[in-house]
């Protein structure tokens, strides 16, 4: 096989990519080539041994992918990008844009205007359950819907057990001695004995 493009040049100075481009240009648009066939034609033209081609094969394949003048056509077929109009090229990039439309939208983070970018400040606003308006009614309506009597019975039994220990009517606040550590303690109430 002779390539007219390289007439007068030494074959040892040619790169595999240059030869691949020349082979595909000479064959024409409707004659895409499988990668193996392309490598065999390059080997025959450059008159290289199998070991030389195998050593250069990873670099050649990388160059084929990186070089903008080649295009993979699927099923390991290759062609020249110049053969195809931009509208004809249906690459993975187009399908990725379609996938982004189905992706869930990220929620915007709420910003507290009073935090002023203080990194050490603790924001208690978002973790307080009382701030949420998710409570449908009073506290008594929060019992389990399946067995509301179970939780009510537990609360009532707990209250009755506490009343058995110290009934409410026996509690006198006057009998309770306050220590110095108590909040209601004051120096005026202490009587020296």
UniProtKB/Swiss-Prot annotation:
GO molecular function, one term: DNA-directed RNA polymerase activity
Taxonomy, superkingdom: Bacteria
Disulphide-bonded residues: none
Pfam families referenced in this protein's UniProt entry, alphabetically: HARE-HTH
Gene Ontology biological-process annotations: DNA-templated transcription; regulation of DNA-templated transcription
Positions of region (Disordered): 117-193
Compositional bias segments (type: Acidic residues): 117-134, 142-193
GO (cellular component) term, any one: DNA-directed RNA polymerase complex
Subunit annotation: RNAP is composed of a core of 2 alpha, a beta and a beta' subunits. The core is associated with a delta subunit and one of several sigma factors.
Similarity remark: Belongs to the RpoE family.
Annotated NCBIfam families: RNAP_delt_lowGC (TIGR04567)
Function: Participates in both the initiation and recycling phases of transcription. In the presence of the delta subunit, RNAP displays an increased specificity of transcription, a decreased affinity for nucleic acids, and an increased efficiency of RNA synthesis because of enhanced recycling.
HAMAP family from the UniProt entry: RNApol_bact_RpoE (MF_00357)
Name of this chain's protein: Probable DNA-directed RNA polymerase subunit delta
Organism lineage string: Bacteria, Bacillati, Bacillota, Bacilli, Lactobacillales
Gene this protein is translated from: rpoE
């Amino acid at each position: 096989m002779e390539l007219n493009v390289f007439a007068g040049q030494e074959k040892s100075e040619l790169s595999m990519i240059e030869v691949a481009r020349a082979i595909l240009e000479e064959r024409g648009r409707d004659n895409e080539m499988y990668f193996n066939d392309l490598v065999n034609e390059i080997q025959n033209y450059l008159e290289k041994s199998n070991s030389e081609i195998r050593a250069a094969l990873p670099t050649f394949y990388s160059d084929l992918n990186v070089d903008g003048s080649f295009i993979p056509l699927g099923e390991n077929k290759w062609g020249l990008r110049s053969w195809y109009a931009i509208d004809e090229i249906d690459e993975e990039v187009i399908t990725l844009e379609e996938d982004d439309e189905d992706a869930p939208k990220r929620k915007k983070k709420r910003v507290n205007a009073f935090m002023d970018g203080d990194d050490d400040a603790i924001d208690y606003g978002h973790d307080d359950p009382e701030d949420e308006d998710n409570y449908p009614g009073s506290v008594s309506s929060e019992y389990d819907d399946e067995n509301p009597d179970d939780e009510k019975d537990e609360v009532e039994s707990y209250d009755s057990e506490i009343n058995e220990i110290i009934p409410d009517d026996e509690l006198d606040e006057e009998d309770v001695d306050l220590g110095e550590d108590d909040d209601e303690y004051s120096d005026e109430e202490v009587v020296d004995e």
